[in-house]
Structure formats: structure tokens, C-alpha cells
From Swiss-Prot:
Organism: Rhizobium johnstonii (strain DSM 114642 / LMG 32736 / 3841)
Source lineage: Bacteria, Pseudomonadati, Pseudomonadota, Alphaproteobacteria, Hyphomicrobiales
Family matches, as InterPro entries: Ribosomal_uL4 (IPR002136), Ribosomal_uL4-like (IPR013005), Ribosomal_uL4_dom_sf (IPR023574)
Swiss-Prot/TrEMBL keywords: Ribonucleoprotein, Ribosomal protein, RNA-binding, rRNA-binding
Domain of life of the source: Bacteria
Protein name listed in UniProt: Large ribosomal subunit protein uL4
Function summary: One of the primary rRNA binding proteins, this protein initially binds near the 5'-end of the 23S rRNA. It is important during the early stages of 50S assembly. It makes multiple contacts with different domains of the 23S rRNA in the assembled 50S subunit and ribosome. Forms part of the polypeptide exit tunnel.
Assembly notes: Part of the 50S ribosomal subunit.
Family label: Belongs to the universal ribosomal protein uL4 family.
GO terms of molecular function: rRNA binding; structural constituent of ribosome
One of the GO BP terms on file: translation
Positions with biased composition (Basic residues): 64-77
């Protein structure tokens, strides 16, 4: 499909061809959900921990004799039913990461890109370059373009001034093409691709 290319000033800069195999799929929410769940599980720290009955600092001695008191039978005060006792089946430090086939991950990226195209939330910019590393001036450019919540994907090398100027603007993310991922595409309103990013995607999925 043919897609209009614009400059950061909002002027026309020609057209670019977008592959239907990447941007023209019918989006599947189940694929997107699987990839996002995999990304978030991989990101989760898993440092949660509760002490079990073998770890709490209490005596392990029997509370009172077994028979003759008329009370319920108990052993140690470390048991989970007592205040200060160990947690039964509590959380332990672990990795939440799980496997997801590489083909499903690649498919998820294509479906995320296609979903943005279908929602008319993609903008292609000829070059993501800023003359100076000034947040205020770049923020006014974004406001003119209507980009208040957007993910910018540049080429393999990001322009230093653009990256510095954009990193302090709320709801704006800037990534090189190597960092493109389903979660960041879905969580932002608009997807802004540079021409270099489009070419890299075409090369990656050809």
C-alpha cells in the first residue's frame, strides 16, 4: 500500500510503500495478548517472598502436652494458623518468564503494526532529527502534529538531539528499530515511524 510521508514540520515529503504482509493483516487480539503477556511476565521482577514455617523466628518446641489439657492438639507455634507463624504456600522468589515461539513473537509484531494502520494511528516521518536538544521546541512540534501520546521508532542509530529533547516529554517514547515491540506499540496512541524504520521492517520480514 502507498502511504504519505511527512516532515516534522507537517509538510508532504512524498510516499512510501508499505508491505501488506507487515501492515495489511487482519489484527488478532489473541496473538497480541499472548505476546504482551509474555513481555510483561519476562519483565516482572519476581522478588516477592514470604517466610514459611521453617523460616520464621519462633521456637520449634511443642506448645503444651498432647493430652489432658482439654485443648486442641498443637505442635509448634510456627504453624500458619498462629499469629507470627509461617505463611502456608506463600510467594517465593522466582522467575515469571515463560516460553513463546519466535514465530508467534514475529507474528505479534506484524499484527500490532497492522492494528495501528487499521486504526489510522500510524504516521511516517522522513527523518527524526532535531536541530537542537530543546524539549520545549520539540514539544511544540509534537503539539502541532497532534502527537500527545506517541511511540517514535527511528533507524538503527537515533539522532542524539531528538532523543534528548523527547525523553522528558510525558507520554512520548523514542526507540531505535531494534527496540520495537508489541507492548510499547499498543500502549501508545500513535505510532510514528521514520523512513529508515520502515525500510528496516521491510528488510526484517521479507
Amino acid at each position: 500500500m502507498e502511504f504519505n510521508v511527512k516532515t516534522l514540520e507537517g509538510k508532504d515529503a512524498g510516499k512510501v510503500s508499505l508491505s501488506d504482509a507487515i501492515f495489511g493483516l487482519e489484527p488478532r487480539e489473541d496473538i497480541l495478548a499472548r505476546v504482551i503477556r509474555w513481555q510483561l511476565a519476562k519483565k516482572q521482577q519476581g522478588t516477592h517472598k514470604a517466610k514459611g514455617r521453617a523460616e520464621v523466628s519462633r521456637t520449634g518446641a511443642k506448645m503444651y502436652k498432647q493430652k489432658g489439657t482439654g485443648r486442641a492438639r498443637h505442635h509448634s507455634a510456627r504453624a500458619p494458623q498462629f499469629r507470627g507463624g509461617g505463611k502456608a504456600h506463600g510467594p517465593v522468589v522466582r522467575s515469571h518468564e515463560h516460553d513463546l515461539p519466535k514465530k508467534v513473537r514475529a507474528l505479534g509484531l506484524r499484527h500490532a503494526l497492522s492494528a495501528k494502520i487499521k486504526a489510522d494511528d500510524v504516521i511516517v516521518i522522513d527523518n527524526l532529527v532535531a536541530a537542537e536538544a530543546k524539549t520545549k521546541s520539540l514539544a511544540s512540534v509534537f503539539e502541532t502534529l497532534g502527537l500527545t501520546n506517541a511511540l517514535f521508532i527511528g533507524g538503527a542509530e537515533l539522532d542524539g538531539n531528538f532523543k534528548l529533547a523527547a525523553q522528558n516529554i510525558p507520554n512520548i517514547d523514542v526507540l531505535p528499530i531494534q527496540g520495537i515491540n508489541v507492548y510499547d506499540i499498543v500502549r501508545r496512541g500513535k505510532l510514528v515511524l521514520s523512513k529508515a524504520a520502515v525500510e528496516a521492517l521491510e528488510e526484517r520480514f521479507k
